[in-house]
Amino acid sequence: MFLLILYAFLTAVVARKLSAAVSVYRYRKMHGLLLARPLNQKGDVIGFSLFRGMQKSAREGLSLQRHYENTQQHGPTISAVLLGKSFISTSDPENIKAVLATQFQDFNLGERNDAFAPFLGRGIFTEDGPEWERSRALIRPSLSKAQVAELPIIEQHVQNLLSRIPGDGSTVDLQQLFFNFTLDSATHSLLGQPVGFQLSPAGSEAERFSRAFDDAQAFLQVRAKLGPFRGLVRNKAFEVNCQLVHSAVDRYVSEALGRSARPRSEDGKPGSMRYDLLSELASTMTDRTQIRNELLNVLLAARDTTASLLSSVFFMLARHPRVWSRLQQEVVQLEGQRPTYDKLREMRYVRAVLNEALRLFPPVPTNIRCATCHTSLPRGGGVDGLQPVFVANGTIVHYSIWTMHRSTAIYGSDAEEYRPERWLQESDEAPLRPGWGFLPFSGGPRICLGQQKALTEAAYVVIRMLQTFATVQSRDQRPWREHMGLVLSSFHGVQVALRHVEG
């Protein structure tokens, strides 16, 4: 009996494999598709050695750079097997455009929901299909122009930030301060009141919330990398951190549901027509868990993306005094006044500095999608790598914004250099129009709703820093190394020294 059952099982497996192979053959023949160039994985049938190599690179803070170097050898689009799953890796802008926009319906987030669910639940960054569309529609109103331009709230938290930065030339890690600042500004914008981390003493509830938030999201990256094996790993600290963050946000949700939604002013008090996201959600939903999930999904992006950008900006400014000096020349035109929303838009060099930091250090430097059907990508097949390639149902497509942003075909021979002027038409060189070659905030239907808010806040902080400090110097000459959480940051922080403007 046992042998009969085993025989039936093996027969079913073989039949399923043959059926899949026939399906692939017919689809490829019908559409004239080639296969992407395979990575040499001799003896590594399930891709475990590849996984170990990737983990080693990540520990060394070099995974992004090594991917870029590999594309110089193998081309921008390759196929491989990783932990038993077929995947294609690409940095070709046409392929990324297909995945994110023109063939959007052929791909979903894959296992992201399972990996992130214990912390983020179901929300805009973990859902697909109608549920994602519903979440996006709920969140969009809170990121209108009126919300983007809430400069008085930003100023309040900038003052707290500036009070924490020594101006006597002593060394400070700006990266940590920026993440503290954006936690306050993001929670103020989303919850109607800040957690108050910047002004809280060590051991406070706000500090515990911040630490739990950071540690929980860091472990999400581990869960994502473990793929189908994530269920075998239990992390008690992760569970405790999730519970702490959930309990804290649930208190805000309960307060919001306990009162009717009402107009709020820019400082969060009753008065004008400003609504924070929590009030918006509480006025249209009653499911406490779903409200919390949506808030955490947006908080993760709103807080970490801006902090990542600011850290990259000042990491480079501390090493490029010429750029700092030119920024000063532009900012001095404000004559010490706080920038208005209209003035922010006029600061062309400030925007160029932000764009160059986003190019070299995109906050989300890589991402993945999963094919939901047999489909294709525009390029990567054939000897020249320019022919369409087949993508089987279930294939993981990994795309690297980091590598694409270093393409000499898009950015010229100096693509690896830091040069904000490339974004300004100031010489005989052709104006830079990278199109789908510049995606710091993704693209297509899932493009980041908060990109203007992030750019506004980052520009405001840069200008206020320039108005406060006369000089900035690097106090760490080690080369930049990545720290990959859900967003990119510097492994060594941003160790600098600043001196106050005299008078």
From Swiss-Prot:
Its EC number is 1.-.-.-. Pathway: Mycotoxin biosynthesis. InterPro entries: Cyt_P450, Cyt_P450_CS, Cyt_P450_E_CYP52_ascomycetes, Cyt_P450_E_CYP52_fungi, Cyt_P450_sf. Residues 1-15 form the signal peptide. Glycans are attached at N180, N393. It comes from the Eukaryota. Heme binds at C448. One of its GO terms (molecular function) is heme binding. Keywords: Antibiotic biosynthesis, Glycoprotein, Heme, Iron, Metal-binding, Monooxygenase, Oxidoreductase, Signal. Its cofactor is heme. It holds the Pfam family p450. PROSITE patterns: CYTOCHROME_P450. CDD domains: CYP52 (cd11063). One of its GO terms (biological process) is antibiotic biosynthetic process. Belongs to the cytochrome P450 family. Cytochrome P450 monooxygenase; part of the gene cluster that mediates the biosynthesis of burnettramic acids, an unusual class of bolaamphiphilic pyrrolizidinediones that display potent antibacterial, antifungal, and cytotoxic activities. The first step of the biosynthesis of burnettramic acids is the hydroxylation of proline by the proline hydroxylase buaE to generate 4-hydroxyproline. This is Cytochrome P450 monooxygenase buaG. It comes from Petromyces alliaceus (Aspergillus alliaceus). The lineage of its organism: Eukaryota, Fungi, Dikarya, Ascomycota, Pezizomycotina.
